[in-house]
Amino acid sequence: MKHVNKILAGLITCCVILLLSGCSPRQGEKHDFSIGKGTFLLDGKPFVIKAAEIHYTRIPAEYWQHRIQMCKALGMNTICIYAFWNIHEQKPGEFDFKGQNDIAAFCRLAQKEGMYIMLRPGPYVCSEWEMGGLPWWLLKKEDIKLRTNDPYFLERTKLFMNEIGKQLADLQVTRGGNIIMVQVENEYGAYATDKAYIANIRDAVKAAGFTDVPLFQCDWSSTFQLNGLDDLVWTINFGTGANIDAQFKKLKEARPDAPLMCSEFWSGWFDHWGRKHETRDAGVMVSGIKDMLDRHISFSLYMAHGGTTFGHWGGANSPAYSAMCSSYDYDAPISEAGWATPKYYKLRELLTQYADSGQVIPDVPAAYPLIEIPAFTVGEVAPLFDNLPAPQASKEIKPMEQFDQGWGTILYRTTLPAVKEGTTLLIDEVHDWAQVFADGKLLGRLDRRRGENTVVLPALAAGTRLDILVEAMGRVNFDVAIHDRKGITDKVELISDTGRQELEDWQVYSFPVDYAFVQDKKYAAGDKLDGPAYYRTTFELDEVGDVFLDMQTWGKGMVWVNAVSYTHLT
């Protein structure tokens, strides 16, 4: 069963929530958080932020409380989070803040556990996340300029920010909540220099109701002054192994009386498909945090717990396109599965020595129980080409966004003229992984990661059906390449010794990442097929617990369990 686009659907249930009593900030109690000379002030007293970055989108909601408790037991006093625009507004004007997307519920859980919140609402977040958190449908406007004063981009950003304000503005510490700081944009100096744009985003954040707590902007030590606004707190991002004094040298010169903070201290690094797992030395990480604490420098550990980038939400790097994998373990102190690692205990030992006055660091919460499910086989199959959705006609090739599709797979179909053996099929460009079929026979695969865009064809008769099946693997999340449209972005040509011919008159079929779409297929008993297909099975559990699904013998595709898209296989 090593074919592509195989999809497993199963039946499984989820778990329990561990409970641990919390401390201040207590819900309903109002506080003041402000900027003092060389320090942050909480109710007028010096306060060092020790933040753990975790993402509500990368942790099942049933586990939120446990992971927050793990951060508190690590010795942290704050949780740092992004707000991911594209998961909350998957279609223009349709906002979702329920269930897994209930960011306010996540913040309230943190407050229940005695943790403050640093909020980073973007609009751009990077985070190895699809398009850096920006919604795909922005790319339907062909001339849009993302992260600029483009009128449409600003209009949509303000609408989103207002919705975030409706959810979270009343959770500022001055109003009885636990939000102590709010970020404006994200590492913009790595993208452009445009203080007017940053000012517009700042104003959008304020207009959304975030007027009570300090606003800050983060960047690298080499770029923080490019877009620095006088009324914002400036913070620096860097990682394990950095020289602390060198990182803050320019900031201290520019603002000698300002509090210092590393808003992203990278505990590890992210992983790409096809590469080795990244790690960073625990001792070096702990040493860097000690250096900051000895200097009364606040920090946010990115990541304290990375979790999993479920479904299609992983991003990619460019140039030399490289997609992020589903695991966002990040070599963080808390593993992807939520377990305390040796790095966790080494850092906990340090932070215990730097506990806040009156802070009681609780015991480390127990991990969720593991269960084992006996091996099972796939019982039903539905061939993809026998289960096509209704097509859309298009004279020319267009990317999937122009067919109102954001993610998943798209099929471009046309008929060929007579083709001589050795003719080259040129696809410009494949975003991101394609299979080429002639009358259902696989002729080749193309991988954007390897710069592949041609298939040499055998002799083919006029009227042969050409199918190009393209899978989107994640939009670029960093730098100017975030304008990353999917499918085939330009044209398809036949190149032979007699010249070039652009292919036209396409039938286009969209396969969204949607369980209702996957479920509604003509399944029949069977195991493996030659070609792309949907696969389905069911199994029963005698007990619930964490379990790992081993897909090593499978190929490319996605997995759904109880209608939830858990992982992207590549």
Task: Explain the meaning of each model-derived region.
Residues 23-78:
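N-terminal carbohydrate-binding accessory modules
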Residues 66-129:
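Aromatic-lined substrate-binding rim segments of carbohydrate-active enzymes
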Residues 93-99, 123-147, 198, 233-234, ...:
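Aromatic- and acidic-residue-enriched segments that line the glycan-binding/catalytic groove
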Residues 190-207, 220-250, 310-315:
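Substrate-binding cleft/loops of secretory-pathway carbohydrate-active enzymes
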Residues 241-333, 339:
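Catalytic-core region of carbohydrate-active enzymes that cleave or remodel glycosidic bonds
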Residues 422-437, 539-562:
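Aromatic-lined ligand-binding clefts that engage carbohydrates, nucleic acids, or primary amines
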